[in-house]
Amino acid sequence: MNKLTLLLLLSLAASVSLAEPVDVKVRVLANDAKFVGTSMGGAKVVITDVESGVVLASGVTKGGTGDTGLIMRKPREHGQSIVTDSAAVFNASIDIGRPTRVRVDASGPLGYPDSTAQVSATHWLIPGHEITDGWTLVLPGFVIELIDAPRKSSRGDEIPLQVKLVMMCGCPTQPGGLWDSDQYTIKGQLWKGDTMISEADMEYTGKTSHYRGVVPVAASGELEMLVYAVDTETGNTAVITSPLLVR
């Protein structure tokens, strides 16, 4: 082994020895609600080195939605944690030899692809320093599902639309509830291309998280059913669509 090769190997060994693992915890919190965990399919988390573009870790949050009282009801002082041991989390151990800027991307809930949202944030990883509760990314929106949507109809008919609307963590919505749908606007619409044909309010059915409305069919051809929900207080929104063929 020549002297140059030996020096290169020693240099490589030294750089490797300088690297040390930093444990990272990432949680995804539904906006105005609880943690996105196993019950909703979790949220995908990807941690990327900003400078090199190399993915350092990836996985899915697993665990429960957390403590409702602690997250939603109990007044908190500055810096007080809302994390409990059961709260859904993605854990990773990342080897770094120097402070490294990373981007954390989260998308979910994975069990409901029609309602998936994505958020990202940048952080610095510092060797020898771990964040006690980890990083929490806030995921906006609702999960909305169309229930038994018709595929065909005739002009002049009335289309019954029904949806299930929950928070991104799966928490229920209802009038006067903790997640109060009285402050939401929920509407059903029929579209033909870029033209809205008809619209109706969606009303609570009496069954938790379920809403329905009747939309008149005032056109023929290939239409699109659309239901949207908006909470102007929190900024949460959701849209679901389905095709409708009208003869």
Predicted regions and their residues:
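N-terminal signal peptide c-region/cleavage motif recognized by signal peptidases
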Residues: 13-16
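Surface-exposed, short loops/turns at beta-strand junctions within beta-sandwich domains
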Residues: 95-98, 216-222
